[in-house]
Every structure is written in structure tokens, then in C-alpha cells.
């Protein structure tokens, strides 16, 4: 702890080792370092050769001051915060036998120049093996989630036209904060854009719930701030997760 009372977290431990994304059968697109596990941890626990691609995982410049969220999480600098969160993400995903890929876009809280939807879609489409099932966020409420959701929608349109598999998940904790209203609105919007979403029946075995809970516990720097901001819902849905399979609406004809 520094003399001014700010906790400085150490990330000196080496990162767990990670396989390459080339052999992944399932790839989950995550806006931030924790969103994939918050929303899809049970699915990740159930699937072999799963990977999480986190979009806003770039490390800010050393001169970047901490955001209010960083301060609430106990960090004295922005790059220290992101390096610690990367380490936590690697530990969490390793516990689920999942791999990870961190893109270098900065979190919106650092007041960065945002990519366009097409730029981000191109990056995602190029990073993910064509044979993998791609699962992305609806893109609910928060700026980074909305940008990631819009880019994923563009990628899904492309991949479905190529005969590839895509699905979408409800972003937690935002999905439950309004009892699913924003998710229902977003699903209607996807339908208007030519994508039909079919809810998956989700098994909810105790072992997968326990695996997700253990993975969430790895995000030590995030748990306190999440709970203070959003209440118990922030710690992730341990009931059935909300996932929809996507197909082109014109396939109904």
C-alpha cells in the first residue's frame, strides 16, 4: 500500500499458459476482461476447446491516470489495473480449461479514439477460425458492450451467409438489471436487421455452476466494485444462462 492509502496490486506471477486459438471449437466474444465468464461461464465449463476473445483488453500508456473504476478497485494507475485484470482473466479461464485472446482496444473509460463498427468487425472476423462457432454479446446498455454487440452483429451476418455457426448471449449483469427488457428490445432489433434468434434450452448442472463460481472468484479486483455498483446480480448468473442461436431470417422462407 502506498503512503496515500492506494493499494498497489502485484502481478509478478507468470501468466498461465494458453493454447492457440486455431483449434478452438467455440469462441466467445467478450467486451471486457470478465464479461465472458459473467455471462457464459457455465457454457465455457461444458465445452472443450473453448476460447474467449476480449475486445477492450489493451493496456493504456504509462501516463494514463486511473479511472474512477480503477480507483474503486484499488489501483493507482490505469496500466497496472489492466495488467492485473489480464492476469485475473487468464486464471479464471484456465480454471475452465478455456483459452484467451486479448485485443488491444482500450476501454472507453480511458477516453480513447473508438474504432468503427466495421473496423472492429473486421478484426473479430479475422481473429476467429472460420470453423469455430462464434458467440457474441447482444450489446446491452454500456458503451463498450453496445459497440461490441454491433460489431458482432456485422460478423454474424457475414458468417451466417458463409454457412457458419453463430449465437448471441445476454450481457450480465445488465440483462437482469432491467429484468430482460433491454435484451428483448435488442432481439427485436436483430430480427428487424434480418437475424432470427432461437432461445437455447440450457442445462444447469451443479458442477457447471460451481466451476463458474470458482472462475468468477478469480476476478478479485473486480468483485467488490461490481457488487457495490450493481448489487448481487453483478457476480454472474448461476442459473441457466441466456443464449440464442442465430440464423438468417430469410432462411425461414
Label each PLM-derived region with a short phrase.
Residues 1-19, 85-103, 108-115, 127-129, ...:
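The feature marks non-catalytic terminal segments
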Residues 1-158:
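Active-site beta-strand->loop->alpha-helix modules in alpha/beta enzyme cores, enriched
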Amino acid at each position: 500500500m502506498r503512503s496515500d492509502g492506494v493499494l498497489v496490486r502485484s502481478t509478478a506471477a507468470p501468466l498461465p499458459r494458453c493454447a492457440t486459438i486455431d483449434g478452438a471449437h467455440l469462441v466467445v466474444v467478450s467486451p471486457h476482461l470478465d464479461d465472458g465468464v459473467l455471462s457464459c461461464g457455465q457454457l465455457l465449463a461444458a465445452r472443450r476447446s473453448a476460447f474467449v476473445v476480449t475486445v477492450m483488453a489493451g493496456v493504456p500508456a504509462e501516463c494514463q491516470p486511473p479511472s474512477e473504476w480503477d480507483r474503486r478497485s484499488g489501483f493507482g494507475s490505469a496500466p497496472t489495473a489492466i495488467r492485473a485484470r489480464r492476469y485475473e482473466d487468464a486464471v479464471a479461464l484456465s480454471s475452465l480449461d478455456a483459452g484467451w485472446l486479448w485485443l488491444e482496444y482500450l476501454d472507453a473509460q480511458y477516453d480513447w479514439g473508438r474504432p468503427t463498427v466495421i473496423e472492429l468487425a473486421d478484426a473479430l472476423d479475422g481473429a476467429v477460425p472460420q470453423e469455430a462457432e462464434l458467440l457474441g454479446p447482444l450489446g446491452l446498455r454500456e458503451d463498450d458492450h453496445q459497440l461490441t454487440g454491433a460489431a458482432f452483429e456485422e460478423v454474424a451476418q457475414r458468417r451466417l451467409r458463409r454457412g457458419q455457426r453463430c449465437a448471441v448471449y445476454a450481457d450480465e449483469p445488465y440483462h437482469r438489471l432491467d429484468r430482460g427488457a433491454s435484451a428483448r428490445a435488442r432481439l427485436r432489433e436483430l430480427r428487424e436487421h434480418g437475424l432470427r434468434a432461437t432461445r437455447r434450452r440450457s442445462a444447469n448442472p451443479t458442477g457447471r455452476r460451481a466451476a463458474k463460481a470458482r472462475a468468477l472468484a478469480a476476478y478479485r479486483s473486480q468483485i467488490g466494485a461490481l457488487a457495490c455498483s450493481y448489487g448481487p446480480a453483478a457476480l454472474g448468473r448461476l442459473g441457466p444462462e441466456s443464449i440464442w442461436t442465430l440464423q438468417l431470417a430469410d432462411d425461414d422462407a
